[in-house]
């Protein structure tokens, strides 16, 4: 099963330019991207040789777009997949909007409409957007609702409305400067999608990228509930097949899954929040990682998933780039119980990261603490 997934996660794609980057993101589906450099490193791992300028060009042309969507987390997706994640996210997060903003007079859609209207004419700075909505809620809803905007929960929902795209102030898509927001419908032509239809298509995207997968994996990844996911699987009929895993669990897969790809991509440096972990519900992340080792890659206190090393089809270490003056070094820490990462096998993965991030990596430290 692991090899089936790796073939989809590491497809064979011709070229290393902008169009190849877009094709990769299309194959992978929405990529979780709380860390801005994440998509660049994901491209480096799966399309080694693709450059920083190629990834940036795809962003600049809005061939791939960044928005807060599935499960209220930042994702990068193709322009074609974006309406799907937007539709599903708006539905699944509606109750959170209602509760966090203490809405009584207004419904959620009225508030969202105002967010989109304000961000329609130009790219809005995050602080300006939040202040506008605080004042608007004070006038149209209540003082209590406006006061909720002072807290992180309500303000995060508003600035993270999935109908808004994010972009950096300085063109550096790999840095934490993506504090400009604009309604997606005013950036490119956007046809609204019914959320039930969107969930069907996203289920197909998920199985095509992470399958075979369980119904709980699909529900977790999309942020939707099991009842709706079960209805989708029933609706797909013979477009999906059931498989019985060695663990006795029922898995689902596309009847006609993607072909080709690399069943063993070798050693790769994967980004924070990589799909080999975050593409599955927490109990199912054992496909590529021993669950006893989760605490070595997931820092529960702040919810951060470390960048990880894939070797022989398993996650065996974490890594990070360490700045020392003007130099950048690579620090790798093995996961206890897993094989050590051989220094002589890191050459190509390092070169791929250097090209994708436009950096030069100096020393490699296989013993330095990465936390």
What does each model-identified segment do?
Residues 1-285, 289-371:
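Long, low-complexity intrinsically disordered regions
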């Amino acid at each position: 099963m692991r090899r089936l997934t790796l073939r989809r996660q590491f497809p064979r794609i011709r070229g290393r330019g902008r169009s190849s980057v877009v094709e990769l993101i299309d194959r992978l589906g929405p990529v979780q991207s709380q860390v801005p450099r994440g998509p660049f490193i994901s491209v480096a791992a799966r399309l080694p040789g693709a450059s920083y300028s190629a990834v940036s060009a795809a962003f600049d042309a809005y061939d791939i777009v960044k928005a807060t969507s599935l499960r209220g987390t930042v994702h990068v997706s193709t322009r074609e997949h974006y309406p799907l994640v937007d539709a599903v996210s708006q539905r699944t997060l509606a109750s959170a909007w209602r509760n966090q903003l203490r809405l009584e007079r207004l419904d959620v859609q009225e508030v969202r409409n105002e967010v989109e209207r304000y961000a329609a004419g130009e790219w809005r700075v995050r602080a300006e957007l939040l202040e506008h909505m605080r004042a608007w809620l004070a006038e149209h809803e209540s003082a209590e609702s406006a006061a909720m905007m002072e807290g992180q929960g309500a303000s995060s929902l508003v600035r993270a409305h999935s109908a808004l795209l994010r972009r950096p102030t300085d063109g550096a898509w790999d840095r934490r400067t993506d504090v400009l927001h604009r309604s997606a419908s005013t950036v490119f032509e956007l046809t609204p999608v019914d959320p039930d239809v969107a969930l069907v298509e996203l289920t197909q995207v998920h199985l095509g990228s992470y399958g075979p997968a369980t119904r709980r994996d699909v529900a977790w990844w999309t942020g939707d509930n099991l009842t709706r996911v079960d209805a989708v699987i029933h609706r797909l009929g013979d477009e999906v097949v059931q498989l019985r895993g060695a663990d006795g669990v029922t898995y689902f897969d596309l009847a006609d899954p993607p072909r080709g790809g690399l069943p063993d991509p070798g050693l790769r440096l994967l980004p924070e929040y990589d799909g080999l972990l975050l593409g599955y519900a927490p109990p199912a992340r054992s496909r590529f990682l021993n669950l006893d080792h989760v605490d070595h890659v997931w820092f529960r206190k702040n919810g951060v998933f470390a960048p990880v090393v894939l070797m022989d089809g398993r996650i065996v270490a974490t890594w990070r780039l360490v700045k020392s003056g003007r130099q950048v070094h690579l620090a790798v820490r093995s996961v206890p119980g897993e094989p050590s990462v051989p220094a002589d096998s890191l050459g190509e993965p390092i070169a791929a990261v250097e090209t994708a991030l436009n950096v030069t990596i100096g020393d490699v430290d296989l013993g330095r603490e990465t936390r």
